[in-house]
Amino acid sequence: MKHVRLLVFTLLLLPALAAGQQSAPPAPGATPPQTGTTPPVSARVSLDDAIRMSLQHNHALQALRSTIQQSLAEEITANLRPNPTLGLDAQFLPIFQPSQFSSDYIDQQAQFDAGVGYLFERGKKRQHRLQAARDQTALTRSLVSDSERQLVYNVGQQFVDVLLAESTLEFAQQDLESFKKTVDISNERFRVGDMSEGDFLKIELQLLQFQSDVSAARLARIQSLAALRQLLGFESVPDDYDVQGTLDYQPVRADLTGLKSVAAINRPDLRAAQQAVTAAESQLSLQKANGKMDITGTFNYTHTAGVNTGAFYYSMPLPIFNRNQGEIARAQFAITQAQEQAGETAQQVSTDVVQAFANLQTNDQIIQLYQGGYVEQAKKSRDISEYAYRKGAASLLDYLDSERTYRANQLAYRQALASYMLALEQMRQAVGTRNLP
């Protein structure tokens, strides 16, 4: 009896143990299975990170890269041989006189034919088709590379815009906090009768301008980050992402001749223009091959009157009128067009380098002017006027004028730094590489 009760108790306990095992929490340190990847909670993106993300996640670029796979698929099509043809027929069957159906009738009276045909391409058409497709693939790769170059430039440009917006916002917030202290001091002077009500109202109204500057700078930062995220791919960064970096001046010492040489080697659009000439020449060779008449060969087996026979047939169009003259002429003019476009692209590359170099030099000179003393002079003038005003030794108008001059100088200096960094990005785009000589 004890054994029976023990057996019943065990059977009742097993389901509970199984349920407990199924619902048991994971062990400490165990990692649950990942069903998908999600962006981090927060992220600070550097310029190099932004470029890498855009090349990996930008949907427009990904769509364009698919054209390379399409060109590779066209190479497969171009290399295919013609399919053979199969023909079957049965003649003189007594369909309307079924009583005559017999093995003797089928053997002696009916006729059966079976034939196999094949198109023999002349002029090495398949080889020329494949070469033309390969040249088109090479051209497509270069065009995609040029789109990557344009995307990298756009990312760099937008990244600098974000840095400028953040620098402007930081300065506006600092300026607002500093001016609030001036308002507090002015309020105390007005309370003790050391300042007129009109002057105090001017101070308070000026505070509105500082607050408006902060709001405008904050909006510019949000818009710049959104525009940059569009280039990076929205799913590659979290909603509250930020950039890592500051407005910086990095002098570049390079000569124009060396930059032109680098551009001639690295610019993918120039390479694409040269490959377009090669592709046009391949098309001309293909059209000349298409002018060669193909031969169709057929072997036909026939059974009739109890006799099995075979026959060979060959056919070829006579090239009297159509020898593909029009397409050959068109391909020749296409070569001329591609050559002219390649020359135009080479000139455009030189023009881009010259313009970018001049822009970089001009912005470099402007930075030198600001760093040569104008920034410090404006700050020193503002500090002196602020100290004198707080001590009652300067008028309100003099102080406000020095404050406006300082703000304008700081904003212009930040804009000059951003313009220089944009000019540097333009130079990198013009030479086709981020590693300047």
Feature-to-residue mapping (PLM):
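Acidic, low-complexity, intrinsically disordered peripheral segments
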Residues: 2-11, 20-23, 37-39, 412-437
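Periplasmic alpha-helical coiled-coil/stalk elements that build and connect Gram-negative outer-membrane
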Residues: 3, 144-262, 359, 363
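N-terminal signal peptide c-region/cleavage motif recognized by signal peptidases
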Residues: 15-16
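Small/polar, glycine/serine/threonine/aspartate-rich low-complexity segments that form flexible
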Residues: 32-43, 76, 87-122, 129, ...
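Mature N-terminal segment immediately following signal peptide/propeptide cleavage
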Residues: 42-67
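Amphipathic alpha-helical coiled-coil scaffold segments and their short linker/junction regions
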Residues: 54-55, 117, 139, 195, ...
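Amphipathic alpha-helical coiled-coil segments
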Residues: 63-78, 147, 151-172, 181-183, ...
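Metallo-beta-lactamase
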Residues: 217, 268-269, 338, 416
